[in-house]
């Protein structure tokens, strides 16, 4: 089982305040564990333009048709002061890792400098912090019915309204998660 470029979808019984009703995009999955970004938990009162202002980045030349008032996500409980940008190619920034044919993660300032300009990648999601699991930890959480998994979908990752991502991600595997009971058993 390789969960890279998959969604983790929190089961209704998962009540952890950070992960409750969350969708996590898995960026890396290997023998050492997993790393992902929550894609549906916007930080209060923080938008992309606020990050750019804080870092003194002025988009040049500014394309007014590109909106910078998109919310910044809480990517997870670790390194909440560190930025992670999920985007579509190109991946020619100084700290980019290609996750799939159409998804890249970048942690360097140079991608931020393209936001709001014609050089910006087509789709962008900005997050602060990340989520991580040690070897075997995520697999155990899945066995314990904390998570569903589904192949990642670009539309949900970048375009689906944030409030709908949990429900829509579950629909990828034919589940109406809103009507699912809070406690599941093993068959």
Swiss-Prot record:
**Gene3D superfamilies from the xrefs?**
VC0467-like, VC0467-like domains
Of the GO CC terms on this record, one is: cytosol
**Which cysteine residues pair off into disulfide bonds?**
none
InterPro entries from the entry? AlgH-like
Q: Which NCBIfam families match?
A: PRK00228.1-1 (NF001266)
PANTHER family for this protein: UNCHARACTERIZED PROTEIN YQGE (PTHR30327), UPF0301 PROTEIN YQGE (PTHR30327:SF1)
**Similarity comment:** Belongs to the UPF0301 (AlgH) family.
Q: Mind telling me what this protein is named?
A: UPF0301 protein KPN78578_33170
Kindly list the organism's lineage.
Bacteria, Pseudomonadati, Pseudomonadota, Gammaproteobacteria, Enterobacterales
């Amino acid at each position: 089982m390789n969960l890279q470029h998959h969604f983790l979808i929190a089961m209704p019984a998962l009540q952890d305040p950070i992960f409750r009703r969350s969708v996590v995009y898995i960026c890396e999955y290997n023998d050492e564990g997993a790393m992902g970004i929550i894609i549906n938990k916007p930080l209060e009162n923080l938008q992309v333009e606020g990050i750019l202002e804080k870092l003194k980045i002025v988009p040049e030349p500014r394309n007014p048709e590109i909106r910078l008032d998109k919310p910044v996500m809480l990517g997870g409980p670790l390194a909440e002061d560190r930025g992670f940008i999920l985007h579509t190619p190109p991946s020619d920034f100084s700290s980019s890792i290609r996750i799939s044919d159409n998804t890249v993660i970048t942690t360097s300032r140079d991608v931020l400098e393209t936001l709001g300009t014609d050089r910006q990648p087509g789709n962008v999601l900005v997050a602060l912090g990340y989520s991580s699991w040690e070897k075997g930890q995520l697999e155990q959480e899945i066995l314990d019915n904390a998570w569903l998994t589904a192949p990642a979908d670009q539309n949900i990752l970048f375009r689906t309204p944030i409030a709908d991502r949990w429900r829509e991600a579950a629909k990828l595997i034919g589940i109406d998660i809103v009507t699912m009971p809070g406690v599941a058993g093993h068959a």
